Amino acid sequence: MKPHILLVEDNATVLGATALFLEGAGYRVTTAASLAEAIERARANPDLNLVITDYHLRGADTGKQVIAAVRELRGPTFRAIVISGDTSSAVHAFDGDNYLCWLGKPANSSLLLTVLRNFAPAC
């Protein structure tokens, strides 16, 4: 069975398109557009296996905060994928995290599926 993914993206068009793509590939997807929504969805869906998040969200919220909040609920080895166009300081925010994968924006759909197959097969 494929992982249940929490997808966090503040751009509604990107969120909808990515969710549709992942669902078409057979994944179960729960969406959130903010840190607060991500925490709410993580609490409401105990069967989540993985989070995919944009790095920069609305206001001062970041994907790093999303991952930290979900890991507080699910444990420090909860797997995460960050998708972002920011390749500067954001990259270094995750140095040494063996349970995280980083993809640049725009994320190639076939690359995302490859990462999901290889990074999260046993979630």
Model-identified regions with their sequence ranges:
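Conserved acidic carboxylate
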Residues: 9
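Two-component/phosphorelay signaling modules centered on CheY-like receiver
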Residues: 12-30
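C-terminal output helix
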Residues: 19, 107-120
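Conserved phosphotransfer cores of two-component systems
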Residues: 43-46, 69-77, 95
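Conserved phosphotransfer microenvironments
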Residues: 54-71
